[in-house]
């Protein structure tokens, strides 16, 4: 190049490639992964995620968020603090942080059911939100098992054999027949109580009743019933439960489920909470229902999303936490985290680093009906 001394690199290229850096903030963490020369220490391995980068670092931040929720939840309240127990419509005592857990139905179909059951059994969360499948699949598993299969199994052949596929899980259709046999007498009883005792059924009351009737400690909703943890499912008819309610309406019509009372219930849990935390696995109605309840208090104090959805189609499922901040569903001074990952991989690890580390601090499970 003209003007460049022989044997010297072009000055413009040198300036571009060897541009000097400004100093990073002093609190910037250095990237450092786990050193397996230390042996296999799973707690230390998961701690190292925080400085590993990418979604591992988001996982580490999610651990911090959930531990912050737990720390506030376990703080003793002042004696003169107003509990608003008459307004929340809940039999659960107020704590320093009300934790909302939302999850889609496929997670109950999977082995994440057992992780969720652990949290509910030990009173670690305060409000559950799920879909119809998130209720019925738990109950059905008490009647018959779900099996591992393959994502690649052909739908035509499965249908011919009465096998339903949920990703790489298989549910024999006979399971739903057993569910119908179990559920129909309960629906009959609910209609009778509605007509003779004036019982006003809601989705949450129905789910609590089903948890009582299943009477199986393997069930999420058995423990939700015992520990007075409300389970909200605004789309309760969108699944096998809805199919059974539909069929039952011909045999014994008249069952009414009031979703407005449940709307007041979840909103009041947020409004009168001292602080709130959201842990949301997946997207759709469960994600928005929890976030919208927290709008009623000008946003949640803590939030963790775990899902694989992207924001580029404008979906609520894919929306990052910052979009919820714009709506007032997460507080402006919060530090929410989204982990872009399959919850079946991440959620048990998150519980292992948070709730399970503090199991002794939570009150003993209740055992009365």
Swiss-Prot record:
GO cellular component, one term: cytosol
Gene Ontology annotations of biological process type: glucose homeostasis; positive regulation of T cell proliferation; spermidine catabolic process; spermidine metabolic process
Database matches in InterPro entries: Deoxyhypusine_synthase (IPR002773), Deoxyhypusine_synthase_sf (IPR036982), DHS-like_NAD/FAD-binding_dom (IPR029035)
Pathway the protein contributes to: Protein modification; eIF5A hypusination
Cofactor: NAD(+)
Catalytic activity: [eIF5A protein]-L-lysine + spermidine = [eIF5A protein]-deoxyhypusine + propane-1,3-diamine
Molecular function terms from GO: deoxyhypusine synthase activity; identical protein binding
Binding-site list for NAD(+): 105-109, 131-133, 137, 238, 283, 308-309, 342-343
Lineage top rank: taxon: Eukaryota
Active site: 329
Family as reported in the entry's similarity comment: Belongs to the deoxyhypusine synthase family.
Name listed for the protein in its UniProt record: Deoxyhypusine synthase
Annotated organism of origin: Rattus norvegicus
Gene name for this UniProt entry: Dhps
